[in-house]
């Protein structure tokens, strides 16, 4: 970009009319080809990413405020602001905007001329400045008409604003206000209301500075009490002077700071209460008012932060035991508002702010406050604590770990937070929900630091499970001593659901800490007691906790579940749910389906051996029958280890062979199968209801006969090879008719690639939902020495000879190798 970069903060106005911080970067201006014009560009100082790319349109109204702000509306209901670190940078960018728009840089607002016709624009530009009627009681109606007629035209709004500024007109209007009130001239007061409301819509910073000055503020509010659309006068001034009392919880020595606090409170009151709810059009015209409040708050926080005497005194009073409860409540409320204002700061300033609070001892002070009986004070302290956790959870963790070395568990800050969560008296548990979120942030390993000399995750989690976890689980353990929850009202169920949500998070993100705690304290058994709660959401929370544990596929957890028969409450809940098709039904089926699909053998065996009779009649899903099938296949492999070994050997040997050999063999299988099967004969997969090895016998038997013929041909080839000097393999396979049937049955379980019984196919023992039967007899292998076992090799005792023979076999042509995988 051509221009010098300047450091800025980018803000956007959200739907709640609050400014959102979009990041800090450097602004420049330059021609952007894609936008076909000069544009403002802001690149983030952290990574150089583009924070803002905004074309400088000739019909967009830009405003310069408070020397370091430029504000404009990018589109309807989308306002932007650039807050400059230096005035020089703001002036430079402002000049660039005015240069593009052809405006005078000495004027603090450029105008949008889009609503005016060319003729009107020429008339307005050629006419002299706007001349206001003289400020007299009899001409109030005329003044109101001039203001109202100027609002639609940007140029007329500008001229009206200049006239009001230059002639001291505002103060003369406020003098008329006093006259009208003294005379009880209601009509004149109604006209003044319209005039003052119109001046607000001029959206002019210079006018606001006059209106919100100490001399004029209350009179401006007085004018806005006489809304002609309301039958009676509003009492805003009475509220601000008599009801809303300003209390200095700590004396403020700086008069400028005190005046700024008064001003900000009253302007906020005008925006929120006094002014009528603006229309969409008027809302865009009040953007300067929002900005005025926002940047006032930033200034207040900065001034307070720099006053070390004030902050020192504040924290001294907070932690002093002699401070009475009422005074402490005022101090806490002030500190809460102070922290809320800090959210308007730029990140680097916010870092300095919270670092200052930390150095002043805000966490020990919060510990004292949380121990008080007043619920309002505790609520304010919780809000302050949430600001700290969101800003820097590591700072809070470090404090509580240091504190544990000096104090008992009962008075640890984090345990106080847990106790407040448990003891929340709100029927909706609003405070408990907030505190659960804070605890979750604190125990989340994702935001924990790991350095070369220490690991925050290990240290803090060790501390938490030793000193705090028993406090968190106390309500759960107390409520689950019997087979049903001892307390099952709605509020208790809500609290237990929050605790389970946090424990589920721990299962997912922590490792041995939570595992040891669950197994040692038998937590899962206690949690599953809640499956019998009358509140279905609590039962689902308990099931979700177990599902998270099962999903880890950890054998430590699985052995614990099996040993303690922890599927029993789940099965009971499933049966008690009956035929109702609801979330509980689906969630329970899903956990069993997960066990089947993932083939978790220990849990599969446990469920089938203990609960099959109760579940075998469930026909509307195949989940339980699939589990039974898995179990039968496991038992079959256990009862016939030779078969399992053969399957493994054949499969491993097959995987060692060249890919071209596999492709040739597969092609041979499919071609042969296609030729010999009768035309129109349907192919029945083993996953269908009617599936057994006899259905597949005929085509496979035919294939085996062809295989015998091919192998006899291979034998002749091998003999010829020997004659040419190539050494033949030490053995090769041949099949006798007596063993053909048995081997065919074996092949249906673990034989040929692409066949109905091959590994990985729907009919294999390793795949779900299949049934395969094999005879206990193993296929015979005939060698030169006669019949030997399937895995026996000649000269088995001579290991070196075996290796030599294997090497020789590997050197054979692909077509001459013994087909162990076929």
Curated annotation (Swiss-Prot):
GO MF terms, alphabetically ordered: protein phosphatase activator activity
Biased composition (Low complexity): 761-774
GO biological process: DNA damage response; regulation of double-strand break repair
Location of the region described as Disordered in the Swiss-Prot/TrEMBL record: 744-822
Annotated ranges, domain WH1: 1-100
Comp. bias regions, Acidic residues: 793-808
Any one cellular-component term (Gene Ontology): nucleoplasm
Similarity comment text for this entry: Belongs to the SMEK family.
Protein purpose: Regulatory subunit of serine/threonine-protein phosphatase 4.
Assembly and interaction partners: Serine/threonine-protein phosphatase 4 (PP4) occurs in different assemblies of the catalytic and one or more regulatory subunits.
Name of the protein in question: Serine/threonine-protein phosphatase 4 regulatory subunit 3
Lineage: Eukaryota, Metazoa, Chordata, Craniata, Vertebrata
Gene name as annotated: smek1
């Amino acid at each position: 970009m051509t221009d010098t970069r300047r450091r800025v903060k980018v803000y956007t106005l959200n739907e709640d009319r609050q400014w959102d911080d979009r990041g800090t970067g450097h602004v420049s201006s330059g021609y952007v080809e894609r936008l076909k014009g000069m544009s403002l560009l802001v690149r983030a100082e952290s990574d150089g990413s583009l924070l803002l790319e905004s074309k400088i349109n000739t019909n967009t109204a830009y405003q310069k405020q408070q020397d370091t702000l430029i504000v404009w509306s990018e589109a309807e209901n989308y306002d932007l602001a650039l807050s400059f670190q230096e005035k020089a940078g703001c002036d430079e960018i402002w000049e660039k905007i005015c240069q593009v728009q052809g405006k005078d840089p000495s004027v603090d607002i450029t105008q949008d001329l889009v609503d005016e016709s060319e003729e009107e624009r020429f008339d307005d530009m050629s006419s002299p400045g706007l001349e206001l009627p003289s400020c007299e009681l009899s001409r109030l109606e005329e003044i109101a008409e001039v203001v109202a007629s100027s609002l639609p035209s940007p140029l007329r709004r500008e001229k009206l604003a200049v006239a009001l500024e230059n002639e001291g007109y505002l103060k003369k209007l406020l003098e008329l206000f006093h006259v009208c009130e003294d005379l009880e001239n209601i009509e004149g007061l109604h006209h003044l209301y319209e005039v003052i409301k119109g001046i607000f819509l001029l959206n002019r910073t210079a006018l606001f500075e006059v209106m919100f000055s100490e001399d004029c503020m209350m009179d401006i509010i007085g004018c806005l009490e006489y809304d002609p659309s309301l039958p009676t006068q509003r009492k805003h001034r009475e509220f601000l002077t008599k009801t809303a009392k300003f209390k200095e919880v700590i004396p403020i020595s700086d008069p400028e700071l005190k005046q700024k606090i008064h001003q900000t409170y009253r302007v906020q009151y005008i925006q929120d209460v006094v002014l009528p709810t603006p229309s969409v059009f008027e809302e865009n015209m009040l953007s300067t008012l929002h900005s005025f409040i926002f940047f006032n708050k930033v200034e207040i926080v900065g001034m307070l932060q720099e006053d070390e005497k004030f902050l020192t005194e504040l924290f001294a009073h907070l932690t002093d035991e002699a401070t009475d409860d009422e005074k402490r409540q005022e101090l806490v409320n002030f500190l809460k508002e102070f922290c809320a204002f800090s959210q308007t700061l730029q990140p680097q300033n916010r870092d300095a702010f919270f670092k200052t609070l930390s150095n002043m001892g805000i966490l020990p002070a919060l510990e004292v406050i949380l121990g008080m009986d007043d619920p309002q004070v505790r609520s304010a302290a919780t809000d302050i604590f949430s600001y700290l956790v969101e800003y820097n959870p590591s700072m809070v963790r470090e404090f509580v770990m240091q504190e544990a070395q000096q104090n008992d568990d009962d008075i640890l800050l984090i345990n106080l937070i847990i106790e407040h969560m448990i003891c929340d008296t709100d029927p909706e548990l609003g405070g408990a929900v907030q505190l659960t979120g804070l605890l979750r942030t604190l125990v989340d390993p994702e935001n924990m630091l790991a350095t070369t000399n220490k690991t925050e995750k290990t240290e803090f989690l060790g501390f938490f499970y030793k000193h705090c976890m028993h406090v968190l689980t106390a309500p759960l353990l107390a409520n689950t001593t019997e087979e049903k929850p001892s307390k099952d009202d709605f509020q208790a169920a809500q609290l237990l659901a929050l605790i389970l949500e946090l424990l589920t998070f721990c299962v997912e993100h922590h490792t041995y800490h939570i595992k040891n705690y669950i197994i040692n304290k038998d937590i899962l058994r206690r949690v599953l007691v809640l499956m019998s709660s009358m509140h279905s959401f609590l039962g689902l929370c308990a099931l979700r906790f177990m599902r998270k544990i099962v999903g880890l596929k950890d054998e430590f957890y699985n052995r614990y579940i099996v040993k303690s028969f922890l599927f029993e409450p789940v099965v009971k809940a499933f049966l008690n749910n009956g035929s109702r098709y609801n979330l509980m039904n689906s969630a329970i089926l899903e956990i069993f389906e997960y066990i089947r699909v993932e083939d978790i053998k220990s849990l599969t065996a446990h469920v089938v051996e203990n609960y099959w009779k109760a579940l075998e009649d469930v026909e509307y899903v195949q989940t339980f029958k699939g589990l039974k099938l898995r179990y039968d296949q496991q038992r079959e492999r256990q009862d016939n280890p030779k078969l399992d070994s053969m399957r493994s050997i054949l499969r491993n040997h097959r995987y060692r062979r060249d890919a071209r050999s596999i492709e040739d063999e597969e092609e041979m299988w499919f071609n042969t199968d296609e030729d010999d099967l009768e035309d129109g004969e349907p192919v029945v997969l083993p996953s269908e209801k009617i599936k057994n090895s006899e259905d597949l016998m005929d085509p496979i038997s035919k294939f085996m006969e062809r295989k015998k013929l091919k192998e006899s041909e291979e034998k002749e080839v091998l003999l010829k090879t020997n004659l040419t000097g190539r050494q033949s393999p030490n053995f090769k396979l041949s099949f006798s008719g007596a063993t053909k049937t048995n081997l065919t049955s074996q092949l249906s379980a673990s034989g040929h690639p692409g066949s109905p019984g091959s590994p990985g196919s729907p009919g294999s023992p390793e795949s779900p939902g299949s049934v395969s039967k094999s005879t206990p007899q193993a296929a015979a292998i005939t060698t030169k020495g006669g019949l030997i076992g399937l895995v026996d090799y000649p000269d088995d005792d001579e290991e070196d000879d075996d290796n030599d023979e294997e090497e020789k076999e590997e050197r054979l042509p692909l077509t001459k190798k013994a087909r162990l995988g076929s």
